[in-house]
Curated annotation (Swiss-Prot):
Organism, as annotated: Glycine max
Record key words, sorted: Flavonoid biosynthesis, Isomerase
Top-rank lineage group of the source organism: Eukaryota
Family assignment from sequence similarity: Belongs to the chalcone isomerase family.
Known EC number: 5.5.1.6
Role: Catalyzes the intramolecular cyclization of bicyclic chalcones into tricyclic (S)-flavanones. Responsible for the isomerization of 4,2',4',6'-tetrahydroxychalcone (also termed chalcone) into naringenin.
Site (Important for catalytic activity): Y108
Protein name per Swiss-Prot or TrEMBL: Chalcone--flavanone isomerase 1B-1
SUPFAM superfamilies according to UniProt: Chalcone isomerase (SSF54626)
Length: 226
């Protein structure tokens, strides 16, 4: 793969998100689409909890460019369809969520799963199968505790499997802790991060800015394989 010069590292607080990652035992690298902070306004103060990075399979740029090349970063940022095309795109994604402060696994997954259920209900994809998948999802986190710097990895396949891995740092574990085969849930995880009601507007902005550059570079160098 020829690496576009615009694929660079991103720093979110004290967290470093490298431009490329290769999971253990794999020959496939994923490039950093964007990264940003997730936080909440608590008593008029923005409290930062997590840094989120979205990595994608290399063919994602050319896949998305067919529809989105020529758009400005602002146009991409304002287009929900752009983010939905990332979420539903026919390429693998690896999401890294690293903690900026200590979070209890049960409390963390309670909020994440509530957001996922709310989205699936709003688009009519929440049924008995998704309810079972949410239960699996919650169970995977029940014995976890996340100190600062620790990480949850979500690996998403185009077929709908969601792999979960936990690490005490940014290292990708060799083996996944759990694999859940449910496409609506897998898509909902990323939807809640960068979709219509995102937990990380900063991540959305990073994706728009960086993909605008990726598309420009692809247009200038159409022989780049992404």
């Amino acid at each position: 793969m020829a690496t576009p010069a615009s694929i660079t590292n991103v720093t979110v607080e004290f967290l470093q998100f490298p431009a490329l990652v290769t999971p253990p035992g794999s020959t496939k690298s994923y490039f950093l689409g964007g990264a940003g902070v997730r936080g909440l306004n608590i008593q008029e103060e923005f409290v930062k909890f997590t840094g989120i990075g979205v990595y994608l399979e290399d063919k994602a740029v050319s896949s998305l460019a067919a529809k989105w090349k020529g758009k400005s970063a602002a146009e991409l940022l304002d287009s929900l369809d752009f983010y939905r095309d990332i979420i539903k795109g026919p390429f693998e994604k690896l999401i890294r969520g690293s903690k900026l402060r200590t979070l209890d696994g049960r409390e963390y997954v309670r909020k994440v799963s509530e957001n996922c259920v709310a989205h699936m209900q709003s688009v009519g994809t929440y049924s008995d199968e998704e309810e079972k998948a949410i239960e699996e999802f919650r169970n995977a986190f029940k014995d976890q505790n996340f100190p600062p710097g620790s990480t949850v990895f979500y690996k998403q396949s185009p077929t709908g499997t969601l792999g979960l891995s936990f690490s005490k740092d940014e290292t990708i574990p060799e083996h996944e802790h759990a694999v859940i085969d449910n496409k609506p849930l897998s898509e909902a995880v990323l939807e809640t991060m960068i979709g219509e009601i995102p937990v990380s507007p900063a991540l959305k902005e990073s994706l728009a800015t960086r993909f605008h550059q990726f598309f420009k570079e692809l247009e200038a160098n159409p022989n780049i394989e992404n």
